[in-house]
Amino acid sequence: MAVLKMTDLDLKGKRVLLREDLNVPLKDGKVTSDKRIRAALPSIEMALKAGARVLLVSHLGRPTEGEFDPAFSLAPVAEHLSRALGFQVPLVRDYIDGIEVAEGQCVLCENVRFLKGEKKDDEALGRKLAALCDIFVMDAFGAAHRAQASTHAAVRFAKVACAGPLLAAELDALSRALDAPAKPMVGIIGGSKVSTKLTLLDTLSKKVDRLIVGGGIANNFIKAAGHEVGRSLYEPELVDEAARLMAAARAAGGEIPVPVDVVVGPEFADSAPATVRKVSEVKPDEMILDIGPETAKLYRDILMQAGTIVWNGPVGAFEVEQFGQGTKALCMAVADSPAFSLAGGGDTVAAIEKYGVVDRISYMSTGGGAFLEFLEGKTLPAVAVLEERSSKG
């Protein structure tokens, strides 16, 4: 993707606005997961090392727009950043009409969603944000699918607009996996409902050589293959769609393999006993909650031969130990595979972390909705405007 990158520019003495995704979970005024802060740190440190005057901008939660609400303040993030960087990062509440930042200093601007017009991609607000800096750096991949004032309008009106290191790395990884993938290409799509990932399943089934489905999504395909699913979560109105996707994949020379065995339980509960059954032997009062060991072996064989793996969603209810063995086996297979592996989505990342293979996945995306929309083939507004700005020079 042809976008100007922060690494292409001389930042010394320049006012550099870094739009990051610091939308972290909070409890009792404390950050409970600093994953997004850690992901942004290299970009911040790079800008500071280059002698920039750094302004950080981010949203947090969903406050009422145009109103200050201490429950959605970035104050806990400023504290966390100060500890991580080793110096005080002041939180500035009134910044929209201009702010003085010294060379080598970093300030955090208060929640951009407190500003009226942010969500509507307001042009006037975009111009004001753009006027705060000499260089606008869009680095928030997690918000790149939203056309908002701080991710879109400001990019349009900034003197210079570019992609930050984190966004650039995301785009490089996604392009490598989707634009010119090493073959065979394997997709793994899990989750509870086909309806939420129908576009993704449709897009990937035409692109990949094999499409592994898991979780509640797989139950629709099991049903479409003529097997009973008992009391399992599935969507009866989408069984025909699952059959169509399997037929379309076959017609294109690919495959959506159906599990040969599954792990069932009487209910989805921590105390529920787990039983392995052939997929053709699921009883009416049972729920499918994981793939079985034979299926895990088949999927491992597929993944070990892959050139590219794109993964979104677990294949079982891995939050309950006895229904997590399939997802664990899949994690190990992706980690062991020589393929370029790209994973994204909250549950997928949680599984990768739980089973200790973070360092063995080629790239883990920081985006949720943005990752899915990119995989679906949709244009991300923040990326599109960066490409437009770059093409005009």
UniProtKB/Swiss-Prot annotation:
Gene3D superfamilies: Phosphoglycerate kinase, N-terminal domain (3.40.50.1260). Its EC number is 2.7.2.3. Substrate binds at D21, L22, N23, R36, H59, L60, G61, R62, R113, R146. Keywords: ATP-binding, Cytoplasm, Glycolysis, Kinase, Nucleotide-binding, Transferase. It comes from the Bacteria. ATP binds at K197, E319, G345, G346, D347, T348. Coiled coil: none annotated. It is found in: Cytoplasm. It catalyses: (2R)-3-phosphoglycerate + ATP = (2R)-3-phospho-glyceroyl phosphate + ADP. InterPro entries: Phosphoglycerate_kinase (IPR001576), Phosphoglycerate_kinase_CS (IPR015911), Phosphoglycerate_kinase_N (IPR015824), Phosphoglycerate_kinase_sf (IPR036043). GO terms for biological process: gluconeogenesis; glycolytic process. Pathway: Carbohydrate degradation; glycolysis; pyruvate from D-glyceraldehyde 3-phosphate: step 2/5. One of its GO terms (molecular function) is phosphoglycerate kinase activity. Monomer. PANTHER family: PHOSPHOGLYCERATE KINASE (PTHR11406), PHOSPHOGLYCERATE KINASE 1, CHLOROPLASTIC-RELATED (PTHR11406:SF23). Belongs to the phosphoglycerate kinase family. This is Phosphoglycerate kinase. The gene is pgk.
